[in-house]
Amino acid sequence: MYAIVEIAGQQFKVSKDLKVYVHRLANEEGSKVSFDKVLLLDDNGNVTLGAPAIEGASVEAKVLQHLKGDKVIVFKKKRRKGYKKRNGHRQYLTQIVIEGITAAGGTKKAAAKKAVVAEEAAATEEVEAAPKAKKAAPKAKKEATKE
């Protein structure tokens, strides 16, 4: 079983007991966190796709540690001008471990949504099938008389 979940603005494919580095979360080390924005859920071939998220589905995780990523060097240079600029950046990260994926009501909600969409489509067909107002007869064309 795996899920595609949005964590801190990024999408991750996660499964149980997977360790993931995400952008810094405000939670303390050792605390549990739940992510409700599950975009896709695969339960042994049974795929549930959210529009945009699956209602009732969640991913539970535990915060392991807060750390900084490797330094990324930003180097700018203009040739023949003597311009060189060197900057560095270290991203603040949080390491989490996925403890479980909950799909409570995910498939039921999706089936209910499909039924509602089908009912709406049937209602629009009934409206379209209603008799339309008669249009005015087209104007008669004047015949060219030859003299």
Curated annotation (Swiss-Prot):
GO terms for biological process: translation. GO terms for cellular component: cytoplasm; ribonucleoprotein complex; ribosome. Residues 125-147 are annotated as: Disordered. GO terms for molecular function: rRNA binding; structural constituent of ribosome. InterPro entries: bL21-like (IPR028909), bL21-like_sf (IPR036164), Ribosomal_bL21 (IPR001787), Ribosomal_bL21_CS (IPR018258). Pfam families: Ribosomal_L21p. Keywords: Ribonucleoprotein, Ribosomal protein, RNA-binding, rRNA-binding. HAMAP family: Ribosomal_bL21. PANTHER family: 50S RIBOSOMAL PROTEIN L21, LARGE RIBOSOMAL SUBUNIT PROTEIN BL21M. Belongs to the bacterial ribosomal protein bL21 family. Part of the 50S ribosomal subunit. Contacts protein L20. This protein binds to 23S rRNA in the presence of protein L20. This is Large ribosomal subunit protein bL21. It comes from Flavobacterium johnsoniae (strain ATCC 17061 / DSM 2064 / JCM 8514 / BCRC 14874 / CCUG 350202 / NBRC 14942 / NCIMB 11054 / UW101). The lineage of its organism: Bacteria, Pseudomonadati, Bacteroidota, Flavobacteriia, Flavobacteriales.
